[in-house]
Amino acid sequence: GASSAYYGPNAFNGVISMITKNPFIKPGINVLLKVGERNLLETGCRYAESFKNKKGEEKVAFKFNFSYLRANDWQANNMEPVFGSTDTKKNWGGYNAVNRYGDEIVYNANSKGQKVGYPGLGNFYRTGYEEKDIVNYDSRNLKLASAIHYKIKPSTELVYSFNFGNGTTIYQGDNRYSLKDIKFFQNRIELREQDKYFIRAYATNEDAGNSYDAITTAILLQNISSSNAEWGNKAYRNYYAAYVVPGVKKLPGFPTMGPYIG
């Protein structure tokens, strides 16, 4: 709706309204340093200054902001079965774990004919990849922001600003995403009079860098080694028949006649 001009087209996802310090009102230097657990380090610096004309009126001001953050993110290592899974950790043929990707692919040998050739096989899953093996938990974030303010009148300002962001981290959306070397650029020009009006034009550009979907990547990686059809219908079953079935048939009480398949 009309608020898109003010908050942006994705405002329905939620809005955080941030008003940055005006260099005419808040000049000077500010420095920030934080440390914390998980090797967290955050540092930042702001420098702002204003200039007056011959009449002693403030006409031009600028500000520059820099911030950098690094930390080791928590690893997603939940190996419990996903909600609604038909198999548990006790299923020797595997199960679909929360933070293991690619193991969503499931096969079964539960038909009567397959019970004869592959006794005890039941449901079995592709091995997949654990998230910790395919993503980088070393989060990094760099932000730069600059602005030039010009007072056309004492209460009317023309502002140009440029913002840049770069980083690597893990993002939770519909899937798990590894945001790697992602970049954001924003240019904005604005004419405003405090508490009366503003006219704003801006452009935001982004470059996903080397980012990727962790779940899709895991599936593609295991398909490179062996397709789902090749792995489930041939390789795994052949291995089971050659190395597991002989031992199963030697178990005490293993039936040797056909009626057991019913």
Features from the language model and the residues they span:
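Periplasmic plug
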Residues: 1-2
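Outer-membrane beta-barrel translocator/receptor signature
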Residues: 5-87, 139-142
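Outer-membrane beta-barrel domain signature, strongest for Gram-negative TonB-dependent receptors
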Residues: 91-262
